[in-house]
Amino acid sequence: MEHNYEWGLEKNPANYSPVSPLEFISRAAEVYPDKLAVVHGKTKRTWSETYKRCLKFASALKKTGIKKGDTVAVMLPNIPEMVEAHFSIPLCGAVINALNIRLDPDSISFMLQHGEAKIVLVDREFTSVISQAILRMENPPLIINVEDEMYSGPGEKIGKIEYEEFMKKGDDSYLGEMPEDEWSAIALNYTSGTTGNPKGVVYHHRGAYLGALSNILEWDMQKHPHYLWTLPMFHCNGWTFPWVIAARAGLNICLRKIDAKLIFDLIREHGVTHYCGAPIVHNQLINAPEEFKRDIKHKVEAFVAGAAPPAAMIEGMSVLGFNITHVYGLTEVYGPASVCAKQESWESLPIGEQAKLNARQGVRYHLQSGTTVMDPETMKQVPADGETIGEVMFRGNITMKGYLKNPKATKEAFKGGWFHTGDLAVLNPDGYIKIKDRSKDIIISGGENISSIEVEDVLYQHPAVLLAAVVAKPDEKWGEVVAAFIELKNGSTVTVEELVNHCKHHLPKFKVPKAIEFCELPKTSTGKIQKFELRKKVNSTEAIDV
């Protein structure tokens, strides 16, 4: 039955419009037209210039036949055209599919076919992969070449038209298209498939809008930040930060590849205020030569996510004067969707204790409805005792629409009205989540559960260790035992026995690694350690009796 607050109070264009992060760039161009939006080498563009370019490129896409719901893929590093693509593609109603630049031709070919990409924007460095990928396709997409002034390496142009030339096809008068429904798709991101084909995660305009606002709120981000692109924009659309920086009319400082010296140089040159990255990026900065780090006299804010960060890494960055905020999430929740919100009471603790508290996965984002740890069988929240293990689950607006063309996987992921992450965690008495492991990373030795993260944290405390990864090694007696792969810092040495003794001082005997191998660890393009590669070789690791 209709009540008084429904009668005659219908939605109309004057009192309602679907939300979209596309609103951010139009406002930035309107209110701060002359503020720098992007810098990359000699290229500098204002928000007014950037918005005009995005609209013109969107118009060119439309003239080429791209329509609402079509997919336009991009295989680009962190360059200005990648920033523009996050606006120009959805401004014509299409969906942006940012491809992982580290993937092989078979994986890229699958994604292009599964997502039905009509056009691919490709940087010359990656044309070899794209050219091989489209050979496997019945209906190859139109290729648009993107030339970066900062790249002088190998690679042939394979497209029929250049990015700038294509843009000229667009109309200067085009105003862009806002979504009629905020539930409309804005982006397609593929999960890294360690088994089988990757799944296509679909984002909606509402989630992208609220995810961006949540990042601003969690960081207390002021107007006009100077944001350094250490995080790949192909990873969860740069955790929504192309839209975040537009919302704050900030400066996008592009970075083609991770290089510690260049990062410190850019921090000094452009007064970088914010950046994001996986623990491996921060480790590179901590362990960079001291001369790289000189004369940084302002506070730099950093988000860290990806693999659970060791407390030693957070402590090390704090010593450098970088304020680290630990966030947690997955592709399916637009990147970060929970934060280890810092409490004033922690400030009086020793820095090591602060680092341990900050290493937790924390609490839900402002605009995410729920983040907790639940028993996946009963779908009840686990006790907040810091001991009972359950599965981390999310629900709310910062959660994907679902998996493209995969209703079975979508239904399974949303079972019980929550998104199931597959991450195993405990709920602490203060309500903060602490991940113990991915469900597949828990090591069960003689009936005892061993968290690989716990063992890795101890290994990271050794001064010679740069990176550590722990996996299960099959064992006839115990079922599984702990195997550790170690990448050492440059110039550092340590023996297997020394590392084992170090672990014995901090862990019960059954958790101490029974096999250790020194090597360069395999990593994804975002710096995550590829444990599935380590599991393949685990049977060949050096055996140690402990």
Q: What residue spans do the PLM features occupy?
A:
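Structural core segment of the AMP-binding/adenylate-forming
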Residues: 24, 63-64, 91-168, 490-492
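Conserved pre-ATP/AMP-binding loop-to-beta segment of ANL
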Residues: 33, 144-145, 159-161, 167-190, ...
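Conserved AMP-binding A3 loop
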Residues: 46-49, 186-210
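Conserved AMP-binding/adenylation subdomain of ANL enzymes
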Residues: 209-226, 234-274, 288-289
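Gly/Ser/Thr-rich phosphate-binding loop
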Residues: 247, 272-277, 286-356, 369-370, ...
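Conserved beta-loop-beta connector loops within the AMP-binding
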Residues: 364-393, 429-430, 492-496, 530
